[in-house]
Amino acid sequence: MNTADFDFHLPEELIAQTPLEKRDASRLLVVDRSSGEFSDQHFDSIIDQLQPGDALVMNNTRVLPARLYGEKPGTGGHVELLLLKNTEGDQWEVLAKPAKRLKVGAQVSFGDGRLTATVVDELEHGGRIVRFDYQGIFLEVLESLGEMPLPPYIHEKLADRERYQTVYAKENGSAAAPTAGLHFTKELLAQIEAKGVKLVYLTLHVGLGTFRPVSVDNLDDHEMHSEFYTLSEEAAATLREVKANGHRVIAVGTTSIRTLETIGNKFKGDIQADSGWTNIFIKPGYQWQIVDAFSTNFHLPKSTLVMLVSAFAGRDLTLKAYEHAIAERYRFFSFGDAMFIK
């Protein structure tokens, strides 16, 4: 299949620039794979799609305020660093702008010298490995100096940075939010749990590759980025029990899906506690192992995320659902509306 097979025209005004006042006031397009029918609802009605005994699986990663603005001591040249992943100790892989000024040994100062980065290695595409020096606790320094790394298609400043975190965000490490989870409130989750649905959490730290468009024509030539995931023994045991009892595993978002399916492939359909790096690319033709239904936001044309949805719902039904969403003026991308596919 070709990348062009997953293209569609999206009017720019449908790209949501800010979150809605209430998280669960967003809209929900319910897509039934067996009948091919669509139903326009509000997000809080997702509880009606869940049955007692089902498991709702969510990614509890927390977004780091990973964008740092600093300057080179001596020259005063402005430098932007975007933290991608912690490689070891105080060393991080970062994306640097402008990268050409940052050779090995170069230093960047942030917040009047409260934080200093020294380049220890050069990578391709503007990537660098830097070592940070600071006083105190790194995450606290980052919280005070860093900014939220909002996606490139969001041009408005975020009034409240907690709105780019899920209400259950816990494990620090993402460069982007698992946005399908942004719609849930604590109250809605309590109602879902009271219905007899098991709430299960895993962790996948979302990398920047999630926004990277597919640059090759043939999908077989596309190389996925790697992201770190963890599924605990307790979570795995709950999911095994849910499956054994004939109930559904329902994933919230593509990051939860990629974690579950990575584990399903690794253990041949079984669900075991595991952690490691995944670069799974789910596209049409994929044999599903674990996930029975899922919620997700509306994604970018030609993105690997539209391909993942197409692998579950079929390309034709997926593009038809997107056509419907555009005609009905649904809001797209990170702060946009959601779909539930069953």
From Swiss-Prot:
Induction summary: Is constitutively expressed in the different growth phases. Its transcription is not subject to carbon catabolite repression (CCR), and is not affected by arginine or low pH. Is cotranscribed with arcR.
Source organism, top-level taxon: Bacteria
Subcellular location per the Swiss-Prot or TrEMBL entry: Cytoplasm
Gene disruption phenotype: The arcA transcript in QueA-deficient strains is 14-fold more abundant than in the wild-type strain. However, no significant difference in arginine deiminase (AD) activity (encoded by arcA) is detected between the wild-type and QueA-deficient strains. The growth rate of a QueA-deficient strain does not differ significantly from that of the wild-type strain, but the QueA-deficient strain does not compete well with the wild-type during serial passage.
Catalytic activity: 7-aminomethyl-7-carbaguanosine(34) in tRNA + S-adenosyl-L-methionine = epoxyqueuosine(34) in tRNA + adenine + L-methionine + 2 H(+)
Subunit structure: Monomer.
Main EC class the enzyme belongs to: transferase
Protein name per the record: S-adenosylmethionine:tRNA ribosyltransferase-isomerase
Protein's job: Transfers and isomerizes the ribose moiety from AdoMet to the 7-aminomethyl group of 7-deazaguanine (preQ1-tRNA) to give epoxyqueuosine (oQ-tRNA). Seems to have a role in modulation of ADS (arginine deiminase system) gene expression, perhaps exerting a negative effect on the translation of arc regulatory proteins.
GO cellular component: cytoplasm
Pfam family, one: Queuosine_synth
Keywords annotated in UniProt: Cytoplasm, Queuosine biosynthesis, S-adenosyl-L-methionine, Transferase
Main location: cytoplasm
Enzyme Commission code(s) on record: 2.4.99.17
The family this protein is said to belong to: Belongs to the QueA family.
GO aspect biological process, one term: tRNA wobble guanine modification
GO MF terms held by the record: S-adenosylmethionine:tRNA ribosyltransferase-isomerase activity
Native organism taxonomy: Bacteria, Bacillati, Bacillota, Bacilli, Lactobacillales
Cross-referenced InterPro entries: QueA, QueA_dom1, QueA_dom2, QueA_sf
Pathway assigned in UniProt: tRNA modification; tRNA-queuosine biosynthesis
